[in-house]
């Protein structure tokens, strides 16, 4: 089972109801980041119902026209030199923050290879520290999974002045590991999606004006 201090949420929550009142006493929600923390740690048997709204996803054109928001973030430490060098080469000439973010994502998607490094996979080390990110961006082959690519892109975005963070969550996948809605069921106006541990993944979130 999932054991973590962060409670899985979807969209902007308007209410969260726990099956037992004692669980509700250990719950905190940040409306700005739309994230929830559960200091008692999640464990088997924990049950809760979230009611909320999924924000509208902006179109590619809307993203491209958006400027980067002005948000104060802690300075990233021990960042490999290749991060700023590659980010500048890819998107340093973009006038809009949204365009720069898209350029980074497109380049990593086009140039990189995906591998978890499991048995039968192409060799790929776990982790997202200084050495691993340098290996990903400046090594002989760009190979990694969502952990490495999300960390690398977040650092590259920061180097260009784009406020960014790495989010950990769930994306429903089919048996081939591709994003799919095969486990999504509609019941009238409600939609239910079942997730498993294999659906855990990481992605980058960049704050743009208006989104």
Kindly label every feature range from the protein language model.
Residues 1-7, 53-56, 211:
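Short intrinsically disordered, low-complexity coil segments enriched in acidic
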Residues 135-144, 191-195:
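Short, contiguous acidic/charged loop-to-helix segments that flank catalytic cores in large enzymes
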Residues 1, 44-48, 200-202:
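Residues at beta-strand starts and edge strands
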Residues 2-9, 36-37, 41, 149:
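Soluble extracytoplasmic regions of secretory-pathway and membrane proteins
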Residues 1-24:
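Beta-strand-rich, non-transmembrane domain signature
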Residues 147-211:
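Hydrophobic/aromatic-rich core segments of domains that either
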Residues 17-141:
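Acidic low-complexity segments
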